C-alpha cells in the first residue's frame, strides 16, 4: 500500500510526535508499505511564533496538492493540524478523497496558555479540522474520552506502545 503521511512535526524536531511518526514509518515500511512523508523540510518555512524550534510551511497548498496528485496514494494520513495538515485536508475534500487524522497534542491548551485564545475556540477549530476525517487517531483512552466530551466524533484508539529494544538499551 502507498501511504501519504502529512505532518508539520518532523526532523530535525525532537518531540513525542516526531518519535511516534518515525516509528510508525519504520513499522509500516518493515511490513512492505511505501510511506511518503510530506514534511516542512520540503517547503519554504517560517518559525512558529512562540514555539522555538518549530518551523511551519508557508502557503503549502498548491505544492501539497501537486505532491498528492503525483503520488496517487492508497491512503492519506494527516498527522498534525498545522499548515500541511490543513492543506492536505483542503485537497482531500476538493478531490473527494478519504483521509485519517490524529490528535497528538492538546494544542488548544497551548494556544490558551500562550495567546489567551479561549479553549472553546481552540477546540471548535480542531473539531472542524477533524470532522471530515474517516477516523481520528488518539493515543489513549483518556484522550478519547476527553475529545468525545468536547464533541469530537469518529475517534479511534491508536496506542503507541514502547520500543522494548530502546528501553532495554537504556
Q: Where are each of the predicted segments found?
A:
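Active-site proximal beta-strand in glycosyltransferases
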Residues: 3, 75, 90-110, 130, ...
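A short, charged, and often flexible helix/loop element on the N-terminal side
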Residues: 40-71, 78, 118
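Nucleotide-sugar donor phosphate/pyrophosphate-binding loop at the beta->alpha transition
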Residues: 98-100, 109-128, 138, 164, ...
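Alpha-helix capping/helix-boundary segments
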Residues: 83-84, 142-144
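Short N-terminal targeting/anchoring amphipathic segment
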Residues: 64-85, 95-100
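N-terminal subdomain of nucleotide-sugar transferases
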Residues: 1-44, 71
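Carbohydrate-associated surface elements
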Residues: 41, 142, 160-161
Amino acid at each position: 500500500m502507498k501511504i501519504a503521511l502529512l505532518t508539520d512535526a518532523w526532523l530535525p524536531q525532537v518531540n513525542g510526535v516526531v518519535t511516534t511518526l518515525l516509528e510508525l514509518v519504520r513499522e509500516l515500511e518493515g511490513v512492505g508499505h511505501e510511506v511518503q512523508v510530506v514534511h516542512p523540510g520540503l517547503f519554504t518555512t517560517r518559525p512558529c511564533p512562540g514555539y522555538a524550534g518549530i518551523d511551519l510551511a508557508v502557503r503549502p497548498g498548491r505544492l501539497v496538492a501537486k505532491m498528492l496528485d503525483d503520488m496517487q496514494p492508497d491512503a492519506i494520513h494527516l498527522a498534525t493540524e498545522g499548515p500541511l495538515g490543513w492543506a492536505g485536508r483542503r485537497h482531500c475534500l476538493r478531490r473527494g478523497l478519504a483521509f485519517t487524522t490524529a490528535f497528538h497534542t492538546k494544542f488548544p491548551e497551548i494556544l490558551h496558555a500562550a495567546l489567551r485564545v479561549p479553549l472553546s475556540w481552540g477546540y471548535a477549530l480542531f473539531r472542524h479540522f477533524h470532522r471530515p476525517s474517516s477516523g481520528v487517531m488518539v493515543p489513549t483512552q483518556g484522550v478519547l474520552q476527553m475529545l468525545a466530551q468536547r464533541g469530537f466524533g469518529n475517534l479511534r484508539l491508536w496506542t503507541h506502545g514502547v520500543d522494548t529494544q530502546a528501553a532495554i538499551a537504556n
